[in-house]
UniProtKB/Swiss-Prot annotation:
Region (Promoter-binding site): 249-256
Organism: Influenza A virus (strain A/Silky Chicken/Hong Kong/SF189/2001 H5N1 genotype A)
Enzyme Commission number(s) of this protein: 2.7.7.48
Bias type Polar residues, positions: 55-64
Gene assigned in the entry: PB1
Protein name: RNA-directed RNA polymerase catalytic subunit
Chief location: host cell
Cellular component per GO, a single term: host cell cytoplasm
UniProt entry tagged with the keyword Nucleotidyltransferase: yes
Species classification: Viruses, Riboviria, Orthornavirae, Negarnaviricota, Polyploviricotina
Reaction equations catalysed: RNA(n) + a ribonucleoside 5'-triphosphate = RNA(n+1) + diphosphate
Listed GO biological process terms: DNA-templated transcription; symbiont-mediated suppression of host gene expression; symbiont-mediated suppression of host mRNA transcription via inhibition of RNA polymerase II activity; viral RNA genome replication; viral transcription
Broad enzyme group: transferase
Transmembrane segments: none
Oligomeric form and interacting partners: Influenza RNA polymerase is composed of three subunits: PB1, PB2 and PA. Interacts (via N-terminus) with PA (via C-terminus). Interacts (via C-terminus) with PB2 (via N-terminus); this interaction is essential for transcription initiation.
Post-translational modification: Phosphorylated by host PRKCA.
Length: 757
């Protein structure tokens, strides 16, 4: 019998059917090869949007710079970056008028944070441009390298451990006539292998000292390295994203802290909150507009899209905003906050790896590094690349392109949101002074605009006014991509609103399944994801139960741990059957040891080990939770771990799951091949750094609220902490006199060794 699919939806409200429209199965596209072309696109496009600005030359670096601020007012609908300073300042003033004291209070909050933040804040984050090696590194390593080089160049403020003191060093470093850095290089030589008697290439890593003059150092300090954004769905073309170096990061962090504090106080801001909190905040704005429009007014909503938000923003505008926001604050605070936008006005974009050429006939491949693009003969390139290079050439210095206008992706999300909200704020009747008025939501470059008016003409006039007001501050609403509807149905940051936000459960589908970390973590993450979706995404009990059964099935196939009494034959079945037969209480076996599944939708919050603990045979308990088990390299496990799961759309999400350490919490060993490459030195540095940080955390666990303050080095801090703790333990009788004496002796020895060094 044929089933008419429409019948499935007879009882379902239309908005619940959104989960059936899910287009994203399979893997998202990843980029391969070089991002140089995408970066050149970004640089060229950004300059095109601001082409009527004024050209100047940076006196320190010699970089040509384009300044579109207060440029010509737009005469057409083309996107442009000609923001008018006075308009931006006026929008800020009105924002403050509608929210009395907002800037003042946010400044006070930020000032407190600035004085307390420690430099290790900069170790958060993933890949960071490491200016010492001129390539990307993990954030912690890049910071360590920067501090090491600052120290060897006589800059020592950072040793106090406060971020603000590190930033003082950054400022001083820019005044120095030269900086001496240590870089890594590879030597390759052909040697005969004693065992196989074949010729092999041996690589050795050298470190060499190099002096950078002021100009070269400044260029590196102002450089953003670029990469291609991966895993973007729904786009044919890839695009470039940027990662700044350590000199810029600290300043950006403080600006974003201030902007975050302002956004928290603005009802139209979709940042910095997320999830249900965000939905509640946004639903309030919609409710307000709908209540007011009940009988007399029409209300329409635009699901908005802005053209190239980042490329039309301008750091000089951000400087104007910060100058206004902090106008009554102490001089030092205003200076610290204005440095980030100033650095961005002088930024350089690194063009990435360059181009790869291959000759089919001679089987040769050669890399043309970005540094060579300035003077290589263009006949080797195809038409489109040739155009790009010709356009970008006047901007090139040492393989980086001068990029003064525009704001590379993801840098000032909070501050640009403040700018967007300030325009939404102008929609109040007391500002429009007419019959139409507007309000809306803003989250970075995404917006939704709600316009109310007595008739259609009024709605049209309101939209036009909003559009033009945006133009004045460098925001370009795309008329092609924005969509208007009766209020009650719109989309904002992938939330779909139809008389309330609709749970689009299918967006979470890719995060169901086995993560592939290890047996213990995967089980925990799997049930946590199902639990979270029951709480947040209208995942009903029947569907959740089914999801759970599918997950267990998936898990058993992944780890080949089918029940001990199953007929399925795998590599592990012989061992698991043996375990099953010799276990008295079979219900106590973990699923990964061939046990039954005891999970149902009521107990998803309990880790499996805890769920089954009372049911386990004693010797099984002993084997399972044995820290001395020689086959497991144990990482110390906090009570809660974080896993990264990928929803279909939007950024990777961090999911907290309960981590119970068992012999199933193994960590795969690092691939050996890295140890023979140039990365080896870096890997050792990183492990060293990790060990130090772990040791430090032992002395100052995150739970202890007081961080060491005003002590000059980590070692001294740890020694003094050890002495205090030992004294407390001795006086309360927790340790014996001999132990106390031994601890004191070790502390003195450490101090003595430091003095000799």
């Amino acid at each position: 019998m044929d089933v008419n699919p429409t019948l499935l939806f007879l009882k379902v409200p239309a908005q619940n059917a959104i989960s059936t429209t899910f287009p994203y199965t399979g893997d998202p596209p990843y980029s391969h090869g070089t991002g140089t072309g995408y970066t050149m696109d970004t640089v060229n496009r950004t300059h095109q949007y601001s082409e009527k600005g004024k050209w100047t030359t940076n006196t320190e670096t010699g970089a040509p710079q384009l300044n579109p601020i207060d440029g010509p007012l737009p005469e057409d609908n083309e996107p442009s970056g000609y923001a008018q300073t006075d308009c931006v300042l006026e929008a800020m003033a009105f924002l403050e008028e509608s929210h009395p004291g907002i800037f003042e209070n946010s400044c006070l909050e930020t000032m407190e944070i600035v004085q307390q933040t420690r430099v290790d804040k900069l170790t958060q984050g993933r890949q960071t441009y490491d200016w010492t090696l001129n390539r990307n590194q993990p954030a912690a390593t890049a910071l360590a390298n920067t501090i090491e080089i600052f120290r060897s160049n006589g800059l020592t403020a950072n040793e106090s451990g406060r971020l603000i003191d590190f930033l003082k060093d950054v400022m001083e470093s820019m005044d120095k006539e030269e900086m001496e850095i240590t870089t890594h290089f590879q030597r390759k030589r052909r040697v005969r292998d004693n065992m196989t008697k074949k010729m092999v290439t041996q690589r050795t890593i050298g470190k060499k000292k190099q002096r950078l003059n002021k100009k070269s150092y400044l260029i590196r300090a102002l450089t953003l390295n670029t990469m291609t954004k991966d895993a973007e769905r729904g786009k044919l073309k890839r695009r470039a994203i940027a990662t700044p170096g350590m000199q810029i990061r600290g300043f950006v962090y403080f600006v974003e802290t201030l902007a975050r504090s302002i956004c928290e106080k603005l009802e139209q801001s979709g940042l910095p909150v997320g999830g249900n909190e965000k939905k509640a905040k946004l639903a309030n704005v919609v409710r307000k507009m709908m209540t007011n429009s009940q009988d007399t007014e029409l209300s329409f909503t635009i699901t908005g899209d802005n053209t190239k938000w980042n490329e039309n923003q301008n750091p000089r505008m951000f400087l104007a905003m910060i100058t206004y926001i902090t106008r009554n604050q102490p001089e030092w605070f205003r200076n610290v906050l204005s440095i980030a936008p100033i650095m961005f006005s002088n930024k350089m974009a690194r063009l990435g790896k360059g181009y790869m050429f291959e000759s089919k006939s001679m089987k040769l491949r050669t890399q043309i590094p970005a540094e060579m693009l300035a003077n290589i003969d263009l006949k080797y390139f195809n038409e489109s690349t040739r155009k790009k290079i010709e356009k970008i050439r006047p901007l090139l210095i040492d393989g980086t392109a001068s990029l003064s206008p525009g704001m590379m992706m993801g840098m000032f999300n909070m501050l640009s949101t403040v700018l967007g909200v300030s325009i939404l704020n102008l929609g109040q009747k007391r500002y429009t002074k007419t019959t139409y008025w507007w309000d809306g939501l803003q989250s970075s470059d995404d917006f939704a605009l709600i316009v109310n008016a007595p008739n259609h003409e009024g709605i049209q006039a309101g939209v036009d006014r909003f559009y033009r007001t945006c133009k004045l501050v460098g925001i370009n609403m795309s008329k092609k991509k924005s969509y208007i509807n009766r209020t009650g149905t719109f989309e904002f940051t992938s939330f779909f609103y139809r008389y309330g936000f609709v749970a689009n459960f299918s967006m979470e589908l890719p995060s169901f399944g086995v993560s592939g970390i290890n047996e213990s973590a995967d089980m925990s993450i799997g049930v946590t994801v199902i639990k979270n979706n029951m709480i947040n995404n209208d995942l009903g009990p029947a569907t959740a139960q089914m999801a759970l059964q599918l997950f267990i099935k998936d898990y058993r196939y992944t780890y080949r741990c089918h029940r001990g009494d199953t007929q399925i034959q795998t590599r592990r079945s012989f061992e698991l059957k043996k375990l099953w037969e010799q276990t008295r209480s079979k219900a106590g076996l973990l699923v990964s040891d061939g046990g039954p599944n005891l999970y149902n939708i009521r107990n998803l919050h309990i880790p499996e080990v805890c769920l089954k603990w009372e049911l386990m045979d004693e010797d099984y308990q002993g084997r399972l939770c044995n820290p001395l088990n020689p086959f497991v390299s144990h990482k110390e496990i906090e009570s809660v771990n974080n896993a990264v799961v990928m929803p279909a759309h939007g950024p990777a999400k961090s999911v907290e799951y309960d981590a119970v350490a068992t012999t199933h919490s193994w960590i795969p060993k690092r691939n050996r091949s890295i140890l023979n490459t140039s990365q080896r030195g870096i890997l050792e540095d990183e492990q060293m750094y990790q060990k130090c940080c772990n040791l430090f955390e032992k002395f100052f666990p995150s739970s202890s609220y007081r961080r060491p303050v005003g002590i000059s080095s980590m070692v001294e801090a740890m020694v003094s902490r050890a002495r205090i703790d030992a004294r407390i333990d001795f006086e309360s009788g927790r340790i014996k006199k001999e132990e106390f004496a031994e601890i004191m002796k070790i502390c003195s020895t450490i101090e003595e060794l430091r003095r000799q060094k």
